[in-house]
Design a protein with these regions (language model features):
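C-terminal transmembrane bundle of multi-pass solute transporters/carriers
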Residues: 3, 53, 63-67, 74, ...
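Hydrophobic core of transmembrane alpha-helices in multi-pass small-molecule transporters
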Residues: 23, 104-122, 232, 300, ...
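Intracellular juxtamembrane helix-capping segments at the cytosolic ends
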Residues: 36, 122-135, 326-339
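Helix-terminus/helix-capping segments at the ends of transmembrane helices and short amphipathic helices
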Residues: 41, 131-136, 141, 249, ...
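Hydrophobic alpha-helical transmembrane segments
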Residues: 106-117, 142-198, 257, 264, ...
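Structural signature of transmembrane alpha-helices in multi-pass secondary transporters
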Residues: 25-26, 57, 116, 147-151, ...
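Helix-loop boundary and gating motifs at the non-cytosolic
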Residues: 2-60, 216-266
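Helix-loop junctions on the cytosolic side of multi-pass membrane transporters
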Residues: 102, 129, 133, 174, ...
Length: 417
């Protein structure tokens, strides 16, 4: 990070460019996965396949994270993110070609989503560290909130826009994703490399040990370990958003446009909260606020499971997404603030696996439970499970629960990296 002494309290121009690139990347990613989910469900009618779709994206992230974190620490993160964006654009273009051929098999779609997951594995640690690299210490929390705003704006625009584009042609949303990724890449290339000291290039066993440093650092920090594992377990239970294609079709009776608006409702709720946090950041009772937000997320999931009305489902999605935005804001502030600069890529890569696991394995869990107990049973099980997790973490992670202010978690300047 840039020293606060050199800051005027304003977000640097280069950070604003990076946040704009994040918006276009999120627009493409979330819009595309929404349409992929609809097409897979239309072709198979299986909630389980919706879960397996998430697994196809997550497995590359889990397998490659021991390498992508050190790569983000060793090389120019801007270039790493740029190559990843180009790979994502390639995967989207191949999806465009395949869907345009009016396919009857979903297996190639799963393969292309796995390819997309490989690109995401490289993009995640680099893209999440870049805005922090360019941010003065005194604006880091604001930048975290603004990054959430950019991401959630993409979540709003992407599914709604891609839903309308889908009506014009089933393959056209993937072409829109290609264009969005290329715009993000062009923006990224206008930002020069940061002055962060890079990890020395090593090979063999030392490289593997470097990859494990992020995991060891998190495990030794009860605050980070508690916050990240809370997100993993809670969202693992509360992965109902992955079932939106089935909810839209079977519970609410709406088509692609309605599904797009439901998915956009997630972004609307999260954006309202993220914008509020960018103007009025949390200043006290950080730990208790995190646990309370996860509890509200669980309650919103339960309401979604019980709803047969589009408006009520839309509101429930806004509420649970807003609560999730608080959780993401707190965790996304804690992790970079508590991590030495030269370890940030490795730590964020490990956190990325937890995030991916919570979202994608949550999709698998929801798909499996929906196949076994029905759509409503799966969603209610997830909501109740999330509330149970909050009770357990409140009891067994007092260090996290009792965090009052973000400044408490900053590492000593003498701490080795």
């Amino acid at each position: 990070m840039i020293e606060a002494a050199n800051s005027s309290g304003q977000v640097p121009r280069k950070v604003k460019i990076l946040l704009t690139a994040s918006f276009f990347s999120a627009l493409a990613t979330v819009g595309q996965i929404t349409i992929v989910g609809k097409q897979v469900y239309d072709m198979t009618g299986s909630e389980l396949n919706l879960g397996l779709l998430g697994l196809a994206e997550f497995l590359p992230l889990a397998l490659l994270s021991p390498f992508t974190g050190p790569i983000a620490d060793r090389f120019d993160r801007r270039k790493v993110f740029s190559f990843a964006l180009l790979a994502e654009a390639l995967a989207s273009f191949l999806l465009f070609l395949y869907v345009a051929s009016e396919p009857s098999s979903v297996l190639p779609i799963f393969g292309l989503i796995a390819l997309f997951g490989v690109a995401r594995a490289f993009a995640m640690p680099a893209s999440r560290a870049l805005p922090i690299d360019w941010s003065p210490d005194d604006v880091v929390e604001r930048v975290v909130a603004l990054k959430s705003v950019a991401f959630q704006a993409g979540i709003i625009v992407g599914p709604a826009l891609f839903g309308f584009i889908f009506v014009a042609g089933a393959s056209f949303p993937y072409l829109a994703a290609v264009i969005s990724y290329l715009i993000a890449n062009l923006l990224l290339l206008t930002v020069g490399p940061s002055s962060i000291k890079r990890l020395a290039t090593t090979g063999g066993r030392q490289a593997f040990r470097d990859a494990l440093e992020g995991l060891k650092f998190i495990r030794k920090s009860p605050v980070l370990y508690g916050a990240i594992s809370l997100d993993l377990i809670a969202v693992l239970f509360g992965g109902a958003v992955a079932l939106l294609p089935a909810i839209a079709e079977d519970r609410l009776g709406v088509g692609a446009v309605g599904l797009g608006w439901l998915r956009a409702g997630v972004g609307i709720g999260a954006t309202i909260v993220a914008v509020t946090l960018s103007v009025r950041p949390l200043r006290r009772d950080i730990g208790k606020s995190l646990l309370t937000a996860v509890a509200v997320f669980g309650c919103g999931t339960i309401v979604l499971g019980l709803s047969t009305n589009f408006v009520l489902a839309f509101v429930a999605l806004m509420v649970l997404a807003g609560a999730d935005a608080v959780s993401v804001y707190i965790r996304a502030s804690l992790v970079p603030l508590a991590t030495p600069e030269q370890m940030r890529g490795r730590v964020l890569a490990v956190e990325g696996v937890f995030i991916g696991a919570s979202n994608e394995l949550g999709a698998v869990e929801s798909g499996l439970t929906a196949a076994a107990f029905g759509l409503v049973g799966a969603i209610l099980f997830g909501g109740v499970g999330t509330l149970a997790v909050v009770v357990i973490w409140w009891r067994f992670f007092p260090a996290l629960r009792d965090v009052k202010d973000f400044s408490e978690v900053r590492p000593d300047s003498s701490e080795p990296s």
